[in-house]
Regions:
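G-domain G4 guanine-recognition motif of GTPases
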Residues: 38, 75, 102-116, 135-148
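Short, aromatic/basic amphipathic alpha-helical patches
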Residues: 48-51, 116-128
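Inter-motif core of Ras-like GTPase G domains
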Residues: 59-76, 88-105
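Active-site-adjacent loop/helix micro-motif of nuclease/hydrolase catalytic cores
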Residues: 78-87, 113-118
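Cytoplasmic membrane-interface segments at the C-terminal ends of transmembrane helices
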Residues: 90-97, 123-128, 192-193
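Beta-strand-loop-alpha "switch" segments that mediate conformational coupling across diverse proteins
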Residues: 124-156
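Non-catalytic sensory/regulatory segments that transmit input signals in bacterial signaling proteins
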Residues: 162-169
């Protein structure tokens, strides 16, 4: 039984993610890290497609799975940040089964910097997470279906960053350098949380 810290604002049940009673992973190798979408179109499905050791948690906490390391994923618009904040508070209250919250992935909702008010709110939301990863805006991802995207695996070297004379490779032939680097950081955090 978890004890909720005094003064912690707990979101109402309708704003929490459910705790899955049955395993989410039913086929193949179980994911080492789960991506929990804070809302629809968060980018969790796309990132789960790109990062081989990740799985889409299907909008709930994978408490019945072998590995229970979770990253909340949200867009950086107001609704996305609000939804992520609710899930982070749910985790702080211990209402996530036996899952371990690794952190928060912020997916840009548009190119360019966040407006000041959103930037401030994103900082508040991020302060509720043990770690934060900021995904860059990758225009190329918009033009491809998920099943066309190149997959990053921890056993392969990360793709080189684009240089002055070298444009980034298309997302269908190689994962974006920053996405591979973030995937590796989360994978390492998941392995460390699992005691490997």
């Amino acid at each position: 039984m978890s004890v909720t810290p005094a003064g912690l604002r707990i979101p109402p049940p309708e704003r929490r993610a459910p705790i899955h009673d049955d395993p989410v992973a039913v086929h193949g190798r179980p994911p080492v890290m789960w991506l929990l979408a804070a809302h629809g179109r968060s980018g969790a499905g796309t990132l789960a497609q790109i990062w081989a050791p990740a799985g889409d948690a299907r909008r709930g906490w994978p408490a019945a799975d072998r590995h229970r390391n979770v990253v909340v994923v949200c867009r950086t618009d107001r609704a996305g940040l609000d939804a992520a904040h609710d899930l982070l508070l749910q985790a702080q209250a211990g209402l996530v089964g036996d899952c371990t919250l690794l952190g928060l992935v912020l997916v840009p909702d548009a190119p360019g910097p966040l407006p000041k008010t959103l930037r401030r709110w994103a900082e508040v939301v991020a302060s509720a997470a043990p770690a934060v990863w900021r995904v860059p805006y990758v225009e190329d991802l918009r033009t491809h279906r998920q099943n066309e995207l190149a997959i990053w695996t921890p056993t392969e070297p990360d793709p080189p960053p684009p240089g002055r004379m070298r444009a980034p490779a298309p997302s269908t032939t190689s994962p974006h350098h920053d996405l591979a680097a973030i995937g590796r950081e989360i994978f390492t955090a998941a392995r460390n949380a699992s005691g490997h």
